[in-house]
Amino acid sequence: FFMKYKPYLMKDVMDTSAQNKFNVISLFAGGGGSSTGYRLAGGNVLCVNEFVEAARDTYRENYPYTKILSSDIKELTGQDFLDATALEAGELDILDGSPPCSAFSVAGKLSHSTAGKHSDGWGQTKNYSDGKMVENIEDLFFEFLRVAKEIQPKVIIGENVAGLTVGEAKQYFNKIQNTFEEIGYDVSAKVLDSRYFGVCQTRTRVFFI
């Protein structure tokens, strides 16, 4: 399976998004990468959450009319997102999330220790460029699923580094899948390489759907 890279303009993004085929809420939205993909597929991104100021500013430049909740995900509830989008629980089509992943990445673990163990990066505090700090960054995927349980979307799509599937980190990989099931969802997880899906670079990530 191979999708050819296809250049696009922001006009293309907005035109396809106007088709409003499905609606999306995106957590850990960054500068809007996944939001762009959903819009190119005809989706309407109703609201996003982004904690980091620089990423949030980039998102606003790309999509100035999308609602952004800027609080730490640990301080937000599913109801906050439902209120922001005028949806009821169970009405959202897709909840998307890409929790910060440095605790499970090769680069992340090496930055914490030369021993090369995933666990050396766990329980650490991550410092962001705007001065904000987040403790126990490895637990953010479970905050994502906590919000999902409250929103009850039809589909949940979560993404993280492929390092989550190997070594000590695999205990988190298994726990994530178990948590999907505990909140009432069937889950499939697979490592995919972006170069086969229309992206002009090699980047492997594990996706939970």
Regions found by a protein language model. Give the residues of each.
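Conserved active-site and SAM-binding loop architecture
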Residues: F1-I209
